[in-house]
Design a protein with these regions (language model features):
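Extracytoplasmic/secreted envelope proteins and their assembly/folding machinery
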Residues: 115, 144, 440-443, 495-499, ...
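Metal-centered catalytic cores of metalloenzymes
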Residues: 331, 646-705, 709-779
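Structured lumen-facing ectodomains of secretory-pathway proteins
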Residues: 358-529, 533-538
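Feature marking well-ordered beta-strand scaffolds used for ligand recognition
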Residues: 14, 26-365, 515-653
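Acidic glycine-/aspartate-rich tracts in secreted/extracellular proteins
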Residues: 125, 184, 435-437, 459-462, ...
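Surface-exposed acidic, glycine-flexible loop patches that form ligand/cofactor-binding
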Residues: 152-156, 411-426, 525, 580, ...
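Secretory targeting and sorting signals
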Residues: 2-27
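Short, ordered loop/turn segments at secondary-structure junctions
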Residues: 167, 351, 435, 458-462, ...
């Protein structure tokens, strides 16, 4: 999220030529066709909101202040403790991650471009968390989304690695992902300051700036996937088995798999099909990457071989919109997602900071009267705040409407607003053509000339020289000023019909009317379509099951003055299936239950002074069975909660399960026909701990015992190794007891709930595939 003035100044200083932006709706294919010539470049500074960094920047510049908050309240959620970061200020805090007794908050200040990094928080006493350290980001860079601590055990490194992204706010800043050794959180050590895609490198840095990252270990190797903000191939995967020497493996553009929905690219705000966030999880033996691809929806990749990812499937947004059926097309904006505990579902979030969209752009007089495609700018005064909820009135052409200055030279002035005569309830509206200067500069020129509203029409290139005559682009804010009027955008065809002329679309052809030409009357109104919300998908089909939003996000009375009421992130409960936690900006922390019957809210928390939650994670302190919910508040720091609603209490204590073992139960067999034994298993889901006592009789001494997944007629995979030795155990004692820690909590919970889906198997040299076996059950 770069400061506007700083971003364009630093690029100019670097001598970077920013090409004309192409329209989001019609020029996605045109952009793609230019990739080879532009070396796969996707500009983050072209005012086309088609990268995560531009979405974040547009959020900062959104029209309608995000001040205010919902009244304080709570239900089934208790605040345990909270702590401000040092130097807390609005918008300083981003994501949260945790390991052991420490949490990590990414901290940034993109406008001033200083004091960015990661705050290290001691949470050993969750009632009294405190900042105990700070990892500084490279000057000119700042972290944000996708902070993570990954526990690695490879030939090259054993310990915990903090992973965070780098966006750029000043010359000297560096992109890519950063890897820090935080095995000793009080003494972090940089392993790799920056790594990523450096072919050909970033606009102003060696590595392309990135928006998010996610790391995982598969077998004896480790990897990280990053969001490349500067190329169409925005899925970048690196090997970090040796985190001090990362190796770039592969890059993908998921639009090559036709994931984009054309209707979404033509409607709503922040149109574009690009990567925003991702997670990776092993599901049924396949390492599966779940990618949130904005208007492309959610995408699954097989990354068993990260150097050669394989497309699995992608989702489609349903028509009409789930929560606003009166809206013809959904907003899109797939922002973040997680797999459910049992991998049957996906909980995804749509981030949407604009609760209104343009209902219609209408020419209301003359021979060409009718409705035409268009949009509303996100940083100007909202149409919905006008007295009648719309703009309507006479128009006049103002040319490019660019300011005269050293950069643009002498520009023809726009006509003064006094040139137009209006009736009561009408607005004086300037029509400008896209090009030469920033959209925001055109709007400021109109504002200074006394106009009540602006219409900015697309130019020939934006209309693909006639192939996309109705394509429009409501771009982002390009310079600092205070908007005081509304602005809408429309296509090049509507521009000519407005002035009753015929477009020629030729390259280099000037077919615009003379400055000062009076046009027909126009009308544009806003349609409330809600803030961003949550979607529940079936993981196998990627079909949507349900959608959810807080009540206020669906109410136009809360469109302004209550902060951002969009969801941001979801965190699936790691133990209890069907429970998840949501960071909901000004909507606070939300707790939902989900399943085949849909989504319902079961808890929430909003402080009396309001909250602004960005990140959310679940966490267990070492040797604790108490689940914590960690949330990062953008304006303060770390907040720690617990859910006090109904949960499965079996997961909070040791629960016993049993298996009677014999050789006749082996599948496919044979087992030892004389063998028998017993397994007593004690399971603690919240601790991720499995304790066992396994005894055997009338078999040769075993060298291993496992818990396998599978019903009684199945030879299933090992899920818990109880013991595994190179040589058989001594003849006596004919039993073994111990505890296994660090077992996946969701797995332990599933064994507790469904013991007959698992069995215990004992192996010896005579029967290496299994001497005796028995199905687990609840005694």
């Amino acid at each position: 999220m770069l400061g506007r003035t700083r971003r364009f100044a630093l690029l100019a200083a670097a001598g970077v030529l920013i090409a004309s932006a192409l329209p989001a709706a019609a020029a996605q294919k045109q952009q793609q066709s230019e990739q080879e010539a532009q070396e796969q470049r996707r500009s983050t500074t072209d005012q086309l909101i088609d990268t995560p960094v531009e979405v974040d920047a547009a959020h900062d510049d959104q029209h309608g202040a995000d001040e205010g908050h919902l009244p304080g309240s709570r239900h089934n959620v208790k605040r345990i403790g909270n702590a401000d970061i040092e130097g807390a200020a609005p918008g300083r805090v981003a994501d949260v991650s945790a390991f052991g007794n420490f949490a990590y908050l990414t901290v940034r200040d993109p406008e001033r471009c200083s004091d960015a990094g990661v705050a290290v928080m001691d949470i050993s006493d969750p009632r009294n968390p405190a900042q105990v350290g700070f990892i500084e980001a490279t000057e000119g860079s700042f972290p944000g989304e996708g902070s993570q601590v990954v526990d690695l055990d490879t030939a090259a490194f054993t310990g915990q690695v903090l992973v965070f992204n780098n966006e750029i706010c000043a010359l000297g800043g560096e992109g890519g992902v950063s890897l820090w050794d935080v095995t000793d959180p009080m003494n972090p050590v940089v392993l790799t300051a920056h790594t990523g895609d450096n072919d050909p490198g970033g606009f102003v840095s060696e590595f392309n700036q990135i928006h998010s990252s996610f790391a995982w270990q598969a077998g004896d190797k480790a990897y990280v996937v990053i969001v490349d903000d500067e190329e169409f191939t925005d899925v970048d995967i690196l090997e970090i088995t040796d985190p001090a020497n990362p190796v770039f493996l592969s890059e993908l553009d998921l639009n090559d798999f036709d994931v984009a929905q054309e209707e979404l690219l033509n409607n709503g705000n922040f149109q574009g099909s690009f990567l925003h966030d991702m997670v990776v999880k092993e599901i049924d033996g396949t390492w599966t990457m779940l990618l949130s691809y904005w208007d492309g929806g959610w995408v699954l990749l097989d990354v068993n071989d990260p150097a050669n990812p394989v497309f699995i499937n992608d989702s489609e947004y349903p028509y009409p919109d789930s929560l606003f059926p009166e809206v013809p097309f959904p907003e899109g904006n797939a922002h973040q997602a997680e797999f459910s505990t049992n991998d049957d579902f996906i909980i995804g979030t749509d981030e949407d900071f604009s609760p209104n969209r343009l209902d219609a752009f209408n020419i209301t007089s003359g021979p060409n009267a009718g409705a035409f495609p268009g949009g509303e700018f996100g940083f100007t005064v909202p149409l919905a705040t006008y007295p009648d909820g719309e703009i309507n009135g006479p128009t006049i052409y103002g040319g490019l409407a660019c300011p005269s200055n050293e950069e643009y030279g002498d520009q023809p002035p726009v006509p003064d607003a006094s040139s137009l005569t209006v009736e009561p309830g009408e607005e004086k509206i300037l029509v400008a053509l896209r090009g030469l200067c920033f959209f925001s500069e055109k709007i400021e020129v109109a504002q200074q000339a006394g106009y009540d509203a602006v219409v900015i029409a697309n130019h020939h290139a934006g209309a693909a020289f006639g192939d996309a005559p109705d394509a429009s682009l409501c771009g982002s804010q390009g310079h600092e000023f205070t908007p005081e009027i509304a602005a809408v955008c429309t296509g090049h065809r509507a521009f000519h019909l407005l002035f009753n002329t015929t477009p020629e679309y030729g390259e280099g052809v000037d077919d615009a009317p003379a400055i000062g030409t009076l046009g027909e009357d126009v009308q544009a109104s806003a349609l409330f379509d809600g803030w961003g919300y949550v979607r529940l998908l079936d993981r196998s089909s990627l079909e949507q099951i349900d959608a959810y939003a807080i009540d206020e996000a669906l109410d136009p009375d809360f469109a302004f003055g209550f902060g951002d009421l969009s969801v941001h992130e979801a965190a699936a409960d790691p133990v209890e299936q069907g429970l998840a936690y949501l960071s909901y900006y000004s909507g606070g922390l939300r707790v939902i239950r989900y399943g085949n019957n849909g989504i319902r809210e079961v808890g929430h928390y909003i402080h009396k002074d309001g909250n602004n939650f960005w990140g959310v994670e679940t966490h267990f302190l070492p040797d604790s069975n108490k689940k914590l919910i960690l949330a990062s508040d953008r304006d303060s720091g770390l907040w720690i909660f617990k859910f006090t609603g109904r949960t499965d209490k079996r997961f909070e204590r040791f629960v016993g399960r049993k298996a009677n073992l014999n050789g006749t139960k082996e599948v496919p067999g044979p087992g030892d026909p004389d063998g028998k034994g017993m397994a007593r298993i004690r399971l603690h889901a919240n601790r991720g701990e499995v304790c066992y006592r396994v005894s055997w009789d009338k078999i040769g001494s075993p060298f291993a015992a496992h818990i396998h997944e599978g019903r009684s007629d199945v030879a299933g995979p090992v899920v818990v190794t109880l013991f595994q030795e190179e040589q058989p155990r001594p003849d006596k004692p004919r039993r073994m007891r111990d505890c296994v820690a660090g077992v996946d909590r969701a797995l332990v919970a599933d064994i507790v709930k469904s013991p007959r889906d698992y069995y215990v198997n004992v192996h010896n040299p005579e029967f290496p595939a299994g001497a005796i076996r028995g199905q687990l059950f609840n005694p």
